[in-house]
Amino acid sequence: YTHTKDMQLYSGPVGMQTLSNAGKADATGVELEAKWRFAPGWSWDINGNVIRSEFTNDSELYHGNRVPFVPRYGAGSSVNGVIDTRYGALMPRLAVNLVGPHYFDGDNQLRQGTYATLDSSLGWQATERMNISVYVDNLFDRRYRTYGYMNGSSAVAQVNMGRTVGINTRIDFF
């Protein structure tokens, strides 16, 4: 449970927006997480959450509306491995992530529906202090809105970057 006072939201026409007090909001929810080590070096992780986040009676403009950018639910599942080799450990990972519906505005007019992404990575623990991994996030290039606002009578949205491919390197000096 979380109670927030003096929550602030952007309001006004595009280009002249200001922060304004949106009142109080309450959030209640539950999160669950489990891990199953089904074979040596391999695990299956699963997690989920359900959240109800609304503006309270104290909010004159948004009473009873859902708080922007708070998905109603989320879930994830991944298979993770550690494969020891003479050249260091290889760490494959495959994950699916589900994000529930949420709004971008206090009026609850601009909504992003539920979407899911599939992510993968392969890490290499070359030494105790060096790790290199390659990843592909959003493998199937699922498009969804990350932000939205009203511009006059038109709704405008920013779309995610789509599939992302990258390399992470970590070196611990101490």
What are these regions (language model features)?
Residues 1-4, 14, 20-106:
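Gram-negative outer-membrane beta-barrel transporters
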Residues 5-6, 142:
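Short beta-strands and strand-coil junctions in structured, solvent-facing domains, enriched
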Residues 11-18, 60-66, 109-114, 148-157:
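Flexible, surface-exposed loop regions and adjacent strand-edge segments
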Residues 17, 27-29, 72-76, 115-119, ...:
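Transmembrane beta-barrel architecture of outer membranes
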Residues 32, 46, 79, 94, ...:
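Hydrophobic, well-ordered secondary-structure elements that form the walls
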Residues 35-43, 80-86, 123-125, 129, ...:
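Structural signature of outer-membrane beta-barrel channels/translocons
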Residues 97-105, 124-174:
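C-terminal beta-signal and adjacent terminal beta-strands/loops
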Residues 106-111, 119-123:
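Short, glycine/charged-rich beta-strand-loop motifs at protein surfaces that mediate ligand recognition
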